[in-house]
Structure formats: C-alpha cells, structure tokens
Amino acid sequence: MYETRDLTGNAGKPVDTNPWPNNSKIAVSFVVNYEEGGERSLLYEDEGFETFLTEAGLMPFPNRPVRERSIESCFEYGSRCGFWRILNLFKKHKVPFTCWAIGQAVEKNPVVVGAMEEAGCEVGSHSHRWINYEGVPPETEYEHIKKSVQAIQKASPSNSAPRSWYTGRASLNTRKLVCQVYKDLGLPQPFDSDEYNDDYPYWVADPLASKPGAEDDKGLLIVPYTLEVNDMKYAVAPGFCNSDDFYTYARDAFDVLYEEGLEGAPKMMTIGLHCRLTGRPGRFRGLQKLMEHITSKEGVWVATREQIAQAWSAKHPYKA
C-alpha cells in the first residue's frame, strides 16, 4: 500500500456537482473518539501506562512496568461522565455524530453503543486497541481489526457492524487488512478515514483488486478525518489552552468553508472530539458555543460519515 502519493487532488477546482442533499453549502461531521478502556495499561498486558492525550501532558514512557492510577482515572472520567455530557448535547440539538469506537473499550462498556444508536449516531471503528500499529505484525493487526468489528456488532442492539473506519496510528498494512477482514466476514467494504489531505471525500483503488483499474477494482472511498480541528490540541503543544481557543479556531474554520460553499464550492468539515477532553466542563463550553454557531446557519448539513459517504457515492461514483 501507499506506493505513491497524490499531491494534486482536484488542483483547486470545486466538484462539478454539489454532493450534499438539499443544496447544502457545507457538510459537517462531528466525530467523538471513544477510547477509554482501550488505552495502554498493565491490566491489558502492555509494557506501561498511557502517555498520549492525557491531563498530564506528554510524558516519557516509563522505563519499568508500572500502573499509573491517576492516568487510568482520567480516562475513566471520559466513559463515566464526558461521553454522556457530549451525547446529551447532540440529542438536545437533534444532530448526529460518528463515533470512532475502540473495540476493547466497547467490550468494557457496551451500553454506549446502544445509547448512540438510539440517538441516531453512527458507531464506526477505531480498531481494537488505542495503540500505534506501526510495527505490529500483520497477523496480529488482522485479529485486532476482526475483534473490533465483532465487539461493536455484538454491542449493537441492531447487530450493526461499523461502516466507517479510522485506526489513527495506522501501519502501512492497515488499509488492506481492514478490507480483507470485511471481505472475510462477508461484510460490505467500509469507508476509510485514515487520511487528512482534502476537504472532499475521494476514491482510491480497491486494495484487494488484482491491480488498479482491473475489473475487480471497485474502489475504496476515503472520507478524510482531521488532526487540526481536533480537541487533542488541549493535550499537545502548541495547542488550545481553554475552550475559547477551541471555539475560535473551529468557528473560523467553519466560517471559511461555509463562505466557500455560499460561493459555489461546498466542502465538508470534520471536528474531532474526545470524551475525556471535551467532556470536561471547562472545555465543554467551547463545544456548546460551536454547536450553537453551526446550527444557527442556513444550508448546513450535520451528518454522520456514513451519510456523507453515501451522498458522495451517489453523485460521484468510482471511476476506475
């Protein structure tokens, strides 16, 4: 995979047909990362405790295997409190989000899947563990992908498998392995979000095809994610110090894309959230203000990533 890079994209040209329903000027995708219970811990036979996106900031990985209860407890806030605070806000405004759900986290708290389905949200997969898959043997990563799909499907009241996929810290094997797992399980190919390189969805060749453009190349739809309009910047430097920083940055990004849509070039925007970060009251205010700003505008389509993928596929099908 990834033998070449595409540095051109649409070369600055808007798509010729508005892909969004009701002639919307922008498609907005909120994404809630549900990772609590899937992070590194000695409890899960890892070498040490989690050091990424914590309230303690970036810390060196411990030289000896220890448990750090303060970090574990901060993650637990996300599943016990933060998730529900965020979910209730979306229910109040009657708009959906897509969840990147870690399979192991879902196994440890399956009730969240039913709650999201009941609220009309989409439960996508974030793989089985919240770890870096670079260097993980392909056979191990394959099993993790399979476990994640099965964990989410088991927790789903409708027995739904995830249709959207985002590993995050992916390996060069991830994309092909995900497609292979879905094929082996008899499931339709998912939509891939392990890219950050466009304001539009776009197609790539099917990783399982004999070769690009061959008869068996059905294409793979990429729905790009974001590390930019993302509350992870509360925990990395340079980043957001308070909820006003988050709100101002996300609002400005929305306003620029919304203006481009009004001028005839409707785009999509993604906003990444984490239960243990934005779920804290002091940061939550920024999300409240952003939600009010976005939902006050005409011609805004707040959608799940599956809905965005379906809309794009209908107007812009794959051309091998």
UniProtKB/Swiss-Prot annotation:
Record's keyword terms, sorted: Cell wall biogenesis/degradation, Chitin-binding, Hydrolase, Metal-binding, Sporulation
One biological process term in Gene Ontology: carbohydrate metabolic process
A GO term from the CC aspect: cytosol
Localisation: Prospore
NodB homology domain mapped to chain residues: 69-303
Main location: other
Entry's Gene Ontology molecular function annotations: chitin binding; chitin deacetylase activity; identical protein binding; metal ion binding
EC assignment: 3.-.-.-
UniProt family annotation: Belongs to the polysaccharide deacetylase family.
Subunit record text: Homodimer.
Protein's job: May deacetylate chitin. Required for spore formation.
Name of the protein this chain belongs to: Putative polysaccharide deacetylase
Organism: Schizosaccharomyces pombe (strain 972 / ATCC 24843)
